Amino acid sequence: MENLEHRVAESRTEQIQIVMPGYTNGNGRLFGGKLVAWMDVVAAVTARRHAHRDVTTVSIDNLQFKKAAYANDTVLLIGQITHVGVTSMEVRVEAFVERLDGSKELVNRAYFTLVALDSHERPTP
């Protein structure tokens, strides 16, 4: 079990994005789809680090847009394994706006289920 816990801790992934004007709607808020795409990449990297295999996203659960991110905001995305099954993994991804003073405000959270794939793109342990 210690080995699994160690691998889970090592799989933690962080990504930083700056919200560019082209990523926003007419009110200057980040498009939700753009944020979800960033979150999906973080979930995939987290799962790949854990499984040491290619992965694919199966589902996204409990996607919660809590606050808006605006043009020129810095967005910090953090992925962490929360559950490991036989072939699947659950990854929690949280997105924060990071202010210039270093404070962070949660803007989104979702749980991604990903499956590890073998060389024939079939689910594998």
What are these regions (language model features)?
Residues 2-59, 115-125:
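Hot-dog-fold acyl-thioester-processing enzymes
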Residues 3-15, 70-71, 82-125:
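HotDog/MaoC-like acyl-thioester-processing domains
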Residues 42-98:
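A contiguous binding-surface segment within folded domains or other stable secondary-structure elements
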